[in-house]
Amino acid sequence: MEMGFRWYGSQNDQIHLADIRQIPGVRQVVGALFDIPVGEVWPEDQIIRLKHQIEAAGLKFTVVESVNIHDDIKIGLPSRDRYIENYQQTIRNLAAAGVRTICYNFMPIFDWVRTNLHFSLADGSQALAFEHRQVQRQPQDIIHEIENNANGFVLPGWEPERLAQVQQLFDAYAGVDETQLAANLNYFLDAIIPVCEECHVQMALHPDDPPRELFGLPRIYKNLADMNRIVAMNPSTANGFTICTGSLGENPQNDVPAIIREFVPQGRVPFVHARNIKFMSDQGDFHESAHLSSMGSLDMFAIMQALHETGFSGVIRPDHGRDIWHESGRPGYGLYDRALGITYLNGLWEALEKQA
């Protein structure tokens, strides 16, 4: 296992590579090219420039998060083939730079949804939160909430150019149900997996966040049954998963350690997001929490134990952190709480290693 840290680049992140290098145990930077429009080819020279920048700081770059999927592919429009060809070339360019894992998602319109970016916790810290009653509002209300409370940062999946077309996107998805969305994912996988095999790259699909239908939009990676359906679409191990403990754990019916034990031995999990959440109601409302098991509703020790016992050898990163110690950065992506999360996860892993 290698510990990683998500970084938004020197132009988009208040955190510096030198800061990341000083977090004990971090070996990988999980990065991306954030200025390339969705659907366009990522230029090889820009990928290599990012790789060299990361390596100059004494870190590695083998995981990309994310190469986003154009909505025409998810909707299944005739224009999807052009965007799929671009995606295939991006895979080749990333592979040429040494990238081996590509995290992506297949969520319509919104990559993730929270109803509060600054939910106040009892200790004075702030965290991301989701309340189901809040999504009864119009999507535009949620968009305003995100835009007005992001501390001046652009959040992944909430880029202004996409949000400006949100009504057109809802109209375009009007005829897409869960069955059709799954068929469109199948079409996409059939086109890109041969390229992945040729280039020795593994795709790592991220779970729906939260794993429930929102605004009438379908979801197709919510639980173990969905994962089995996705495996059946294309049996190649290049068709892999990101296990996001928080996203899957947002459904209390999901047994995250059991999911890990099912798919890590299959060689389908190159990438893990480790995050804890705390349920606030029986309706599935939650806020994010510190990584420590006792601070949330997930057993982080059992999760790390499942990874250890199944021989997980991919990259793991702390997911969203709280805003603590007067930090005011990109919500969920500050330095301090994610660094604390890494220290905790590393401690669990060392204990598991020495007990083995």
Swiss-Prot record:
It comes from the Bacteria. InterPro entries: Man_deHydtase, Xyl_isomerase-like_sf. GO terms for biological process: D-glucuronate catabolic process. GO terms for molecular function: ferrous iron binding; manganese ion binding; mannonate dehydratase activity. Pathway: Carbohydrate metabolism; pentose and glucuronate interconversion. Its cofactor is Fe(2+); Mn(2+). Its EC number is 4.2.1.8. Keywords: Iron, Lyase, Manganese. It holds the Pfam family UxuA. Catalyzes the dehydration of D-mannonate. NCBIfam families: PRK03906.1, uxuA. Belongs to the mannonate dehydratase family. This is Mannonate dehydratase. The lineage of its organism: Bacteria, Bacillati, Bacillota, Bacilli, Lactobacillales.
